[in-house]
Amino acid sequence: MDSQVVEKAKELLRRYPQFSFPLDIEELVTEVGCELIEWKFLSPVKEVKHGRWIGIAEGLERNEQRYLAAHALGHHLLHCGNQLWFRDWHETNVLKQEREADEFAAHLLVPESELEKLGKPTTWEIAEYFGIPEEIAASRLGQFATEQERERWDLLDEI
């Protein structure tokens, strides 16, 4: 878990307190100054971030579209200015940015304050409640969980 990435998601939610959950990611993308468009991308492309435009492939399930929009917004806010690719730029830098965008999306769509209200929900309950893919819900409960969340869940297990 990257605390700077989590903080960036929290900061964005504090800046726009009018949003409730499940988060209207399309409206938030617009508020931030980006434009979300559906596009007929060729497989396997599902999402493209270019400047202020976020393109999402047509025909995807709603929960996947929501996640991809949040993921692309993460790239926009976390990696702005890092769009140049160098010949010797190591693949781990790309993987790091992708992981950060995933973590940002997970915490933006499923913030700690909202997750706490559910007690210790299952992956399916999180996916259903927040309108996200189950894989992202599983990551949010696993690799992207904060230390405070893990401690709280451990206490709930003891009860």
Predicted region positions:
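Active-site hotspot residues in diverse enzymes, especially metal/ion-binding acidic/histidine motifs
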Residues: M1-I159
